[in-house]
């Protein structure tokens, strides 16, 4: 489990989560978020067992290294207004290599589709008023792990 400290999680809180995970025999990989970031999911999205999409140049190096060491490819779409203003990476993974993303991000969508990711999109005008998009409305209920069926 990637466990990040930053504006929302301090070292003491991360230590408590890491201790609980250790009791469950789950390793916590600690990393620190850049100062301008809040949740790790704002920088990094998992789209398949071996594929992640990250904010260009902002994914913490420890997180990127941990993913690559576990066989992940880390895609970084081109930086620009689609990421900053269009919230293109604020998407929801619907299934392996299938996502629901904010409308109006054609370059990012083309980049993701070229990587084999099926993209559906929806308008997020109202969500954007609260500085969010579809990813902000969701929580992960289940994530399958390699070797688990």
PLM region descriptions:
Residues 1-149:
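Histidine/cysteine-enriched polar flanking segments
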């Amino acid at each position: 489990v990637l466990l990040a400290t930053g504006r929302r999680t301090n070292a003491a809180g991360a230590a408590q989560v890491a201790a609980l995970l250790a009791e469950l025999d789950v390793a916590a990989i600690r990393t620190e978020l850049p100062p301008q970031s809040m949740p790790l999911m704002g920088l990094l999205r998992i789209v398949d067992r071996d594929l992640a999409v990250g904010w260009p140049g902002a994914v913490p190096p420890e997180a990127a290294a941990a993913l690559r060491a576990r066989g992940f490819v880390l895609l970084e779409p081109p930086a620009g207004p689609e990421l900053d203003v269009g919230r293109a990476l604020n998407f929801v993974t619907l299934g392996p290599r299938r996502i629901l993303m904010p409308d109006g991000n054609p370059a990012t969508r083309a980049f993701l589709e070229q990587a084999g990711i099926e993209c559906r999109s929806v308008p997020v005008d109202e969500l954007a008023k609260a500085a969010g998009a579809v990813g902000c409305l969701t929580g992960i209920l289940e994530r399958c792990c390699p070797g688990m069926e």
